[in-house]
Amino acid sequence: MRALTPPTIRAAFRGQLGGFALDAAFTVPATGITGLFGPSGCGKSSVLRCLAGLQHLPGSSCEVGGEVWQDDTTFLKPHHRPIGYVFQEASLFQHLSVKANLLYGAPRESGKAHADAVEFDEVIELLGLAKLLARSPRNLSGGERQRVAIGRALLSQPKLLLMDEPLSALDRLTKDEILPFLERLHARLSLPVIYVSHDITEIERLADHLVLMQSGKVLAVGPLTELQSDPKLPLAIARDAAVNFDAEVESYDADYGLVRLQIDGGRLLVPSAPVATGEFRRVRIAASDVSLARELPQASSILNAIAARIVITSPVGANEMLVVLALGREGHGGRLLARLSRRSWDLLQLAEGVDVYAQIKGVALAPGRDGHV
Protein backbone atom coordinates (compact mmCIF):
# COMPACT_ATOMS: atom_id res chain seq x y z
CA MET A 1 0.00 0.00 0.00
CA ARG A 2 1.35 3.42 -0.93
CA ALA A 3 2.06 5.66 2.05
CA LEU A 4 -0.16 8.70 2.38
CA THR A 5 1.51 11.94 1.34
CA PRO A 6 1.43 14.53 4.15
CA PRO A 7 -0.78 17.51 3.27
CA THR A 8 1.00 20.62 2.05
CA ILE A 9 0.44 24.25 1.19
CA ARG A 10 1.76 24.94 -2.31
CA ALA A 11 1.85 28.48 -3.61
CA ALA A 12 3.43 30.38 -6.48
CA PHE A 13 2.53 34.05 -6.79
CA ARG A 14 4.12 36.06 -9.59
CA GLY A 15 3.18 39.46 -10.90
CA GLN A 16 3.39 43.21 -10.62
CA LEU A 17 1.73 44.98 -7.70
CA GLY A 18 2.01 48.63 -8.59
CA GLY A 19 5.74 49.30 -8.64
CA PHE A 20 6.51 46.11 -6.69
CA ALA A 21 7.41 42.80 -8.36
CA LEU A 22 6.36 39.67 -6.47
CA ASP A 23 7.94 36.33 -7.40
CA ALA A 24 7.30 34.02 -4.45
CA ALA A 25 6.95 30.24 -4.69
CA PHE A 26 7.05 27.78 -1.80
CA THR A 27 5.75 24.47 -0.49
CA VAL A 28 5.35 23.96 3.26
CA PRO A 29 3.62 21.35 5.43
CA ALA A 30 -0.06 22.00 6.12
CA THR A 31 0.66 21.49 9.81
CA GLY A 32 2.08 23.65 12.58
CA ILE A 33 3.10 27.27 12.21
CA THR A 34 4.94 28.51 9.13
CA GLY A 35 6.69 31.81 9.65
CA LEU A 36 6.83 34.21 6.71
CA PHE A 37 9.83 36.34 7.64
CA GLY A 38 11.81 39.16 6.12
CA PRO A 39 12.40 42.91 6.33
CA SER A 40 9.56 45.40 6.03
CA GLY A 41 8.42 45.82 2.42
CA CYS A 42 9.74 42.46 1.18
CA GLY A 43 6.29 41.18 0.13
CA LYS A 44 5.17 39.12 3.13
CA SER A 45 1.75 40.73 3.47
CA SER A 46 1.27 40.60 -0.31
CA VAL A 47 1.76 36.82 -0.20
CA LEU A 48 -0.83 36.59 2.57
CA ARG A 49 -3.33 38.63 0.55
CA CYS A 50 -2.77 36.31 -2.41
CA LEU A 51 -3.36 33.26 -0.21
CA ALA A 52 -6.60 34.84 1.00
CA GLY A 53 -7.75 35.65 -2.54
CA LEU A 54 -7.75 39.38 -1.79
CA GLN A 55 -5.13 39.87 -4.49
CA HIS A 56 -5.51 38.14 -7.87
CA LEU A 57 -2.30 37.64 -9.83
CA PRO A 58 -3.05 35.83 -13.12
CA GLY A 59 -0.76 32.90 -13.85
CA SER A 60 -0.27 32.18 -10.17
CA SER A 61 -1.30 29.07 -8.24
CA CYS A 62 -2.37 28.06 -4.74
CA GLU A 63 -3.25 24.64 -3.34
CA VAL A 64 -4.01 23.95 0.33
CA GLY A 65 -4.29 20.39 1.63
CA GLY A 66 -5.03 19.07 -1.86
CA GLU A 67 -7.73 21.69 -2.57
CA VAL A 68 -7.01 23.97 -5.53
CA TRP A 69 -7.75 27.59 -4.68
CA GLN A 70 -6.09 29.07 -7.75
CA ASP A 71 -4.61 27.83 -11.01
CA ASP A 72 -4.95 28.66 -14.70
CA THR A 73 -8.67 27.82 -14.68
CA THR A 74 -9.70 28.31 -11.04
CA PHE A 75 -9.85 31.28 -8.71
CA LEU A 76 -11.83 30.93 -5.49
CA LYS A 77 -13.19 34.21 -4.20
CA PRO A 78 -12.12 35.12 -0.64
CA HIS A 79 -15.49 34.17 0.89
CA HIS A 80 -15.19 30.69 -0.62
CA ARG A 81 -11.76 30.04 0.91
CA PRO A 82 -11.90 28.40 4.36
CA ILE A 83 -9.51 30.84 6.01
CA GLY A 84 -9.31 32.87 9.18
CA TYR A 85 -7.50 36.19 8.89
CA VAL A 86 -5.99 38.16 11.77
CA PHE A 87 -4.75 41.64 10.86
CA GLN A 88 -2.28 43.99 12.53
CA GLU A 89 -5.14 45.95 14.07
CA ALA A 90 -8.06 44.13 15.67
CA SER A 91 -11.20 45.26 13.80
CA LEU A 92 -14.00 44.54 16.25
CA PHE A 93 -17.62 45.68 16.15
CA GLN A 94 -17.83 48.40 18.79
CA HIS A 95 -21.61 48.05 19.25
CA LEU A 96 -21.37 44.34 20.06
CA SER A 97 -20.13 42.60 23.20
CA VAL A 98 -17.00 40.46 23.13
CA LYS A 99 -19.17 37.32 23.04
CA ALA A 100 -21.21 38.66 20.12
CA ASN A 101 -18.01 39.58 18.28
CA LEU A 102 -16.71 36.04 18.75
CA LEU A 103 -19.93 34.42 17.56
CA TYR A 104 -20.14 36.75 14.56
CA GLY A 105 -17.40 34.71 12.90
CA ALA A 106 -19.00 31.33 13.59
CA PRO A 107 -20.60 29.52 10.61
CA ARG A 108 -24.38 29.72 10.52
CA GLU A 109 -24.85 26.93 7.98
CA SER A 110 -25.30 23.46 9.44
CA GLY A 111 -22.58 21.07 8.42
CA LYS A 112 -20.11 23.80 7.52
CA ALA A 113 -17.73 22.95 10.39
CA HIS A 114 -15.10 20.35 9.47
CA ALA A 115 -13.70 17.41 11.45
CA ASP A 116 -11.10 19.56 13.23
CA ALA A 117 -13.61 22.27 14.16
CA VAL A 118 -12.81 24.17 17.34
CA GLU A 119 -15.55 24.66 19.94
CA PHE A 120 -16.56 27.98 21.48
CA ASP A 121 -15.66 26.92 25.03
CA GLU A 122 -12.28 25.65 23.86
CA VAL A 123 -11.44 28.99 22.24
CA ILE A 124 -12.51 30.86 25.39
CA GLU A 125 -10.26 28.66 27.52
CA LEU A 126 -7.26 28.73 25.17
CA LEU A 127 -7.29 32.52 24.84
CA GLY A 128 -8.32 33.35 28.40
CA LEU A 129 -11.46 35.24 27.36
CA ALA A 130 -13.98 34.06 29.99
CA LYS A 131 -13.88 37.29 32.01
CA LEU A 132 -14.21 39.47 28.92
CA LEU A 133 -17.35 38.04 27.30
CA ALA A 134 -19.80 40.66 28.57
CA ARG A 135 -17.51 43.63 27.99
CA SER A 136 -17.51 46.12 25.14
CA PRO A 137 -14.48 46.27 22.80
CA ARG A 138 -14.17 49.93 23.83
CA ASN A 139 -13.12 48.78 27.30
CA LEU A 140 -10.45 46.30 26.18
CA SER A 141 -6.70 46.74 26.13
CA GLY A 142 -4.82 46.31 22.86
CA GLY A 143 -3.75 42.81 23.82
CA GLU A 144 -7.28 41.80 24.83
CA ARG A 145 -8.69 43.14 21.56
CA GLN A 146 -6.21 41.09 19.57
CA ARG A 147 -7.02 37.93 21.53
CA VAL A 148 -10.71 38.46 20.71
CA ALA A 149 -9.83 38.94 17.03
CA ILE A 150 -7.87 35.67 17.06
CA GLY A 151 -10.79 33.90 18.74
CA ARG A 152 -13.24 35.22 16.14
CA ALA A 153 -10.98 33.98 13.34
CA LEU A 154 -10.76 30.52 14.95
CA LEU A 155 -14.53 30.28 15.40
CA SER A 156 -15.03 30.82 11.67
CA GLN A 157 -13.78 27.19 11.49
CA PRO A 158 -10.98 27.82 8.99
CA LYS A 159 -8.76 25.19 7.42
CA LEU A 160 -5.94 27.74 7.31
CA LEU A 161 -5.26 30.65 9.68
CA LEU A 162 -3.46 33.70 8.26
CA MET A 163 -1.86 36.09 10.75
CA ASP A 164 -0.46 39.35 9.38
CA GLU A 165 1.91 40.87 11.96
CA PRO A 166 -0.72 40.38 14.70
CA LEU A 167 1.57 41.75 17.43
CA SER A 168 3.22 44.63 15.57
CA ALA A 169 0.89 47.30 16.99
CA LEU A 170 1.52 46.18 20.57
CA ASP A 171 4.25 47.19 23.01
CA ARG A 172 6.81 44.63 24.18
CA LEU A 173 5.09 43.90 27.50
CA THR A 174 1.77 43.23 25.76
CA LYS A 175 3.49 41.06 23.15
CA ASP A 176 5.01 39.00 25.94
CA GLU A 177 1.53 38.56 27.43
CA ILE A 178 0.03 37.31 24.16
CA LEU A 179 2.82 35.00 22.96
CA PRO A 180 2.03 32.29 25.54
CA PHE A 181 -1.59 32.22 24.31
CA LEU A 182 -0.36 31.71 20.74
CA GLU A 183 1.90 28.92 21.98
CA ARG A 184 -1.11 27.27 23.60
CA LEU A 185 -2.98 27.39 20.29
CA HIS A 186 0.03 25.82 18.59
CA ALA A 187 0.15 23.00 21.14
CA ARG A 188 -3.56 22.22 21.26
CA LEU A 189 -4.90 22.78 17.75
CA SER A 190 -4.01 21.00 14.50
CA LEU A 191 -4.87 24.05 12.39
CA PRO A 192 -2.06 25.16 10.02
CA VAL A 193 -1.00 28.79 10.45
CA ILE A 194 0.89 31.17 8.17
CA TYR A 195 2.39 33.79 10.49
CA VAL A 196 3.86 36.99 9.02
CA SER A 197 6.39 38.98 11.03
CA HIS A 198 9.54 41.04 10.68
CA ASP A 199 10.35 40.38 14.36
CA ILE A 200 12.67 37.38 14.64
CA THR A 201 11.84 36.86 18.32
CA GLU A 202 8.21 36.05 17.43
CA ILE A 203 9.33 33.65 14.70
CA GLU A 204 11.77 31.92 17.06
CA ARG A 205 9.07 31.44 19.70
CA LEU A 206 6.32 30.18 17.41
CA ALA A 207 7.42 28.84 14.02
CA ASP A 208 8.09 25.24 13.01
CA HIS A 209 8.78 26.04 9.36
CA LEU A 210 10.08 29.18 7.73
CA VAL A 211 9.73 31.00 4.42
CA LEU A 212 12.53 33.56 4.26
CA MET A 213 11.80 36.50 1.94
CA GLN A 214 13.73 39.43 0.52
CA SER A 215 12.75 41.99 -2.14
CA GLY A 216 9.66 40.08 -3.28
CA LYS A 217 11.47 36.75 -3.64
CA VAL A 218 11.80 33.63 -1.51
CA LEU A 219 15.39 33.15 -0.34
CA ALA A 220 14.85 29.81 1.38
CA VAL A 221 12.18 27.45 2.70
CA GLY A 222 12.53 24.76 5.34
CA PRO A 223 12.38 23.84 9.02
CA LEU A 224 13.17 26.83 11.23
CA THR A 225 16.26 25.25 12.79
CA GLU A 226 17.78 24.39 9.40
CA LEU A 227 17.49 27.95 8.12
CA GLN A 228 18.75 29.39 11.41
CA SER A 229 21.99 27.43 11.10
CA ASP A 230 22.70 27.92 7.39
CA PRO A 231 25.70 30.30 7.06
CA LYS A 232 24.64 31.20 3.51
CA LEU A 233 21.49 32.87 4.86
CA PRO A 234 21.16 36.17 6.73
CA LEU A 235 19.79 34.63 9.95
CA ALA A 236 23.02 32.79 10.77
CA ILE A 237 25.36 35.70 10.08
CA ALA A 238 23.33 38.28 11.99
CA ARG A 239 24.91 39.67 15.16
CA ASP A 240 21.99 38.24 17.20
CA ALA A 241 22.06 34.82 15.47
CA ALA A 242 20.60 31.94 17.47
CA VAL A 243 19.12 28.48 17.09
CA ASN A 244 16.09 26.88 18.72
CA PHE A 245 15.48 23.41 20.07
CA ASP A 246 12.24 21.79 21.16
CA ALA A 247 13.26 20.19 24.45
CA GLU A 248 11.62 17.61 26.71
CA VAL A 249 11.75 18.01 30.49
CA GLU A 250 13.56 15.03 32.04
CA SER A 251 13.62 16.17 35.67
CA TYR A 252 13.52 19.16 37.97
CA ASP A 253 16.01 19.87 40.77
CA ALA A 254 14.10 21.87 43.36
CA ASP A 255 17.21 22.39 45.53
CA TYR A 256 18.96 24.37 42.78
CA GLY A 257 15.98 25.54 40.75
CA LEU A 258 17.27 23.78 37.62
CA VAL A 259 15.39 21.86 34.97
CA ARG A 260 17.14 19.09 33.01
CA LEU A 261 16.15 19.13 29.34
CA GLN A 262 16.73 16.59 26.58
CA ILE A 263 17.48 18.13 23.19
CA ASP A 264 18.57 16.55 19.92
CA GLY A 265 22.15 15.53 20.69
CA GLY A 266 22.53 16.36 24.37
CA ARG A 267 21.15 17.58 27.67
CA LEU A 268 20.87 21.02 29.23
CA LEU A 269 20.53 22.34 32.77
CA VAL A 270 18.54 25.58 32.80
CA PRO A 271 17.34 27.79 35.68
CA SER A 272 13.56 27.56 35.87
CA ALA A 273 10.49 27.64 38.05
CA PRO A 274 9.13 24.15 38.81
CA VAL A 275 8.05 22.19 35.73
CA ALA A 276 6.59 18.74 35.22
CA THR A 277 8.48 15.83 33.73
CA GLY A 278 7.46 15.19 30.14
CA GLU A 279 6.58 18.79 29.30
CA PHE A 280 7.98 20.21 26.08
CA ARG A 281 9.69 23.60 26.03
CA ARG A 282 11.35 25.60 23.29
CA VAL A 283 14.83 26.86 24.09
CA ARG A 284 16.89 29.51 22.35
CA ILE A 285 20.69 29.46 22.31
CA ALA A 286 22.49 32.50 20.93
CA ALA A 287 25.71 32.03 18.98
CA SER A 288 27.32 34.64 21.23
CA ASP A 289 26.61 32.42 24.27
CA VAL A 290 28.57 29.44 22.91
CA SER A 291 32.30 28.91 23.37
CA LEU A 292 34.38 25.90 22.31
CA ALA A 293 36.93 23.68 24.07
CA ARG A 294 39.01 20.80 22.73
CA GLU A 295 38.62 18.88 26.01
CA LEU A 296 35.79 18.61 28.52
CA PRO A 297 36.30 21.40 31.10
CA GLN A 298 36.86 19.93 34.58
CA ALA A 299 36.22 23.05 36.66
CA SER A 300 33.93 25.71 35.24
CA SER A 301 30.98 27.84 36.30
CA ILE A 302 29.33 27.05 32.96
CA LEU A 303 26.79 24.28 33.60
CA ASN A 304 26.39 23.03 30.05
CA ALA A 305 29.15 21.46 27.97
CA ILE A 306 27.96 19.21 25.13
CA ALA A 307 30.08 17.06 22.83
CA ALA A 308 29.82 18.28 19.24
CA ARG A 309 31.52 18.19 15.86
CA ILE A 310 32.41 21.17 13.68
CA VAL A 311 30.59 20.67 10.37
CA ILE A 312 30.66 24.07 8.64
CA THR A 313 32.78 27.17 9.08
CA SER A 314 32.53 30.60 7.52
CA PRO A 315 34.61 33.76 8.06
CA VAL A 316 32.65 36.77 9.31
CA GLY A 317 34.52 39.95 8.52
CA ALA A 318 38.28 39.96 8.99
CA ASN A 319 38.56 38.67 12.55
CA GLU A 320 35.68 36.32 13.36
CA MET A 321 34.58 32.81 12.46
CA LEU A 322 31.02 31.50 12.33
CA VAL A 323 31.01 27.84 13.35
CA VAL A 324 28.15 25.40 12.76
CA LEU A 325 28.23 22.45 15.17
CA ALA A 326 26.39 19.13 15.06
CA LEU A 327 25.66 17.99 18.60
CA GLY A 328 26.55 14.55 19.93
CA ARG A 329 29.76 12.52 19.99
CA GLU A 330 29.18 11.36 16.43
CA GLY A 331 27.84 14.70 15.24
CA HIS A 332 24.37 13.37 14.42
CA GLY A 333 22.33 15.74 16.60
CA GLY A 334 20.84 19.18 16.17
CA ARG A 335 22.75 22.17 14.84
CA LEU A 336 24.26 24.83 17.07
CA LEU A 337 26.01 28.10 16.18
CA ALA A 338 29.12 29.60 17.74
CA ARG A 339 30.86 32.84 16.90
CA LEU A 340 34.58 32.92 17.70
CA SER A 341 37.42 35.35 17.29
CA ARG A 342 39.89 34.29 14.61
CA ARG A 343 42.59 34.25 17.31
CA SER A 344 40.67 31.67 19.37
CA TRP A 345 40.07 29.64 16.22
CA ASP A 346 43.79 29.55 15.45
CA LEU A 347 44.92 28.93 19.05
CA LEU A 348 42.62 25.91 19.37
CA GLN A 349 43.65 24.66 15.90
CA LEU A 350 40.04 24.15 14.91
CA ALA A 351 38.81 22.91 11.54
CA GLU A 352 35.79 21.24 9.99
CA GLY A 353 35.48 17.66 11.25
CA VAL A 354 37.14 18.39 14.60
CA ASP A 355 35.35 17.14 17.74
CA VAL A 356 34.91 19.75 20.47
CA TYR A 357 32.83 20.58 23.51
CA ALA A 358 30.32 23.38 23.16
CA GLN A 359 30.13 25.38 26.39
CA ILE A 360 26.75 27.10 26.57
CA LYS A 361 26.73 30.14 28.83
CA GLY A 362 23.07 31.05 28.51
CA VAL A 363 19.82 29.36 27.48
CA ALA A 364 16.49 31.18 27.05
CA LEU A 365 13.58 28.96 28.06
CA ALA A 366 10.15 29.77 26.63
CA PRO A 367 6.91 29.18 28.58
CA GLY A 368 5.33 25.75 28.26
CA ARG A 369 3.33 24.58 25.25
CA ASP A 370 1.21 22.29 27.38
CA GLY A 371 -1.59 24.74 28.00
CA HIS A 372 -0.10 26.50 31.02
CA VAL A 373 0.75 30.18 30.75
Curated annotation (Swiss-Prot):
All copies of domain Mop, residue ranges: 299-369
Domain ABC transporter: 4-240
A GO cellular-component term linked to this record: plasma membrane
Key word NADP present: no
Keywords from the UniProt entry: ATP-binding, Cell inner membrane, Cell membrane, Membrane, Molybdenum, Nucleotide-binding, Translocase, Transport
Cited function: Part of the ABC transporter complex ModABC involved in molybdenum import. Responsible for energy coupling to the transport system.
Species name: Rhodopseudomonas palustris (strain ATCC BAA-98 / CGA009)
Subunit-structure text: The complex is composed of two ATP-binding proteins (ModC), two transmembrane proteins (ModB) and a solute-binding protein (ModA).
Main location: membrane
Name recorded for this polypeptide: Molybdenum import ATP-binding protein ModC
